Every structure is written in structure tokens, then in C-alpha cells.
Design a protein with these regions (language model features):
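Conserved ABC ATPase signature
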Residues: 130-134, 138
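Helix-to-loop junction immediately C-terminal to a conserved catalytic motif
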Residues: 48
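ABC-type ATPase nucleotide-binding domains, specifically the catalytic core motifs of the NBD
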Residues: 12, 52, 68, 93-111, ...
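ABC ATPase C-loop
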Residues: 147-148
Length: 242
């Protein structure tokens, strides 16, 4: 569904990602892992058209996206939940959802909003509340909901669990699994390696902007040395399966 071919991208003369190739199949939950500064967020921003592609190509549903405006990617069905959520904190929950659905006819707003509220009932209870007054977990729910308002086929999620309490992490990961079961294709960037491996079908690991591993999550769990070398962690999921 999404394919990167020898992608290199960066910021002016600085190259953040080097010669990266991978493909995300329709309906999959694909995890992109790596230490801070590995190029994960730059990859997501290149897919969305917010970072310069210096070499290589990006395809979505066999259509080349390289060089096309960010709005085109939204219209084609790609949405992003950015790191740090980036909500309009002075607007209400409802108003943030309206912003998320700006590319669709207003007539579809109510149906899309109910779909979001079904996934996150807590947002329905707080739909008139100012986004900046929500808890961190509720704000992450709203960030996901805002992305879903455009009825995407493909969802990019950058650092789902960052700064969240364990209970909220559980709720947000369960929401991703629900979306996957409903047919949404997901690319997840996540620092919580064990949780990412538990839900992902396939995993890529980046280090210094380069691909160092690609395989199924099951295979990755068997490679403890991989996580110690590139992520500096002992992965509980790996340890428990050995």
C-alpha cells in the first residue's frame, strides 16, 4: 500500500534518512523503531510531504507521491498523529475534530465524529471542553480522533505512548488494534519497543538514518542483541520469548 524506494530526505544540506526502502502492506500494522535521532520522524514527515525528499521515491496505492503537495496526500487517504499531538489547545474537542475533517464535505462531519466517539467515549463526554484542559492521555485520544476525521486509509502515528500514564498507554494501543481490525493500515513510530512488537506485524529498525533491520515482529523478538545494540534496551518481549 505504501512503498519507499531508496528514500533519502532531510533539512537543507543535512540528510536525516539515507537510502531507505520498505513496503507496508494493506491492513498491516508496521512499526518503525530506532533511537532518538535515527530518522523515524523525518521519514514520517517525508511521507506526508513536510520534509524535502533528496533522492528516491514514495508510492501510495501504486501512485507516486514524491514531490506532490501535502494536501494531495491527505486527499489520497493518508493522515498523521504527530509527535507531541500538536492540538489547537485553545479550541474545544469538537472544534479540533472539525479541523481534522476540513478536507471532506461538512455533511460527513457528524458521522465521522460519532465514529471517533465510539472509539473514544471519553471524548464524547468532553466534546465541549477546551483541548488544553484535557489530560495527556485524553489529548492523545483527540489527536488520533482528529486524524480519523479525514477517513484515512493509512494512518501514521508518531510516538503514541510518549508522556502517557500506563493506563492511557493501554487504551491508546487498544484503539490502534481496533482500527487495525477494522481494516486501517498503520505505520507506528514508538519508543516503547516491547509494546510495539506486541502489536506490530512487521518491524523496521533505523540507526543514524539507515535501515539496520527489517522482519516480522516474531523474528525481531528472538534477536535480543539487536535491541541492545541499536536501541540500548533489553526488550521484555524478546526476553520472555527466548
Amino acid at each position: 500500500m505504501l512503498r519507499l524506494e531508496s528514500l533519502s530526505c532531510g533539512y537543507g544540506p543535512v540528510r536525516a534518512v539515507h537510502d531507505l526502502s520498505f513496503e507496508v502492506e494493506k491492513g498491516a500494522l508496521f512499526a518503525l523503531l530506532g533511537p532518538n535521532g535515527a530518522g523515524k520522524t523525518s521519514t514520517i514527515m517525508a511521507i506526508m510531504g513536510h520534509v524535502d525528499v533528496q533522492a528516491g521515491r514514495i508510492f501510495f496505492e501504486s501512485e507516486e507521491m514524491t514531490g506532490r503537495p501535502a494536501m494531495d496526500r491527505v486527499k489520497e487517504g493518508i493522515a498523521v498523529v504527530p509527535e507531541g499531538r500538536l492540538l489547537f489547545t485553545d479550541l474545544s474537542v469538537d472544534e479540533n475534530l472539525i479541523v481534522g475533517g476540513y478536507a471532506l464535505p461538512r455533511s460527513e462531519y457528524a458521522e465521522n465524529r460519532e465514529r471517533v466517539f465510539s472509539l473514544f467515549p471519553r471524548l464524547a463526554e468532553r466534546h465541549k471542553q477546551i483541548a488544553g484542559s484535557l489530560s495527556g492521555g485524553e489529548q492523545q485520544m483527540l489527536a488520533i480522533g482528529r486524524a480519523l476525521m479525514s477517513k484515512p486509509k493509512f494512518l501514521l502515528v508518531d510516538e503514541l505512548s510518549l508522556g502517557l500514564m500506563p493506563k492511557m498507554v493501554d487504551l491508546c494501543f487498544e484503539a490502534l488494534l481496533t482500527l487495525k481490525r477494522n481494516g486501517l493500515t498503520i505505520l507506528l513510530v514508538e519508543q516503547n519497543t516491547a509494546r510495539a512488537l506486541d502489536i506490530a506485524d512487521e518491524v523496521c529498525i533505523l540507526a543514524s538514518g539507515r535501515l539496520v533491520y527489517r522482519g516480522s515482529s516474531g523474528e525481531a523478538k528472538e534477536k535480543q542483541g539487536l535491541f541492545e545494540t541499536y536501541l540500548g534496551v533489553v526488550c521484555e518481549a524478546s526476553a520472555s520469548s527466548s
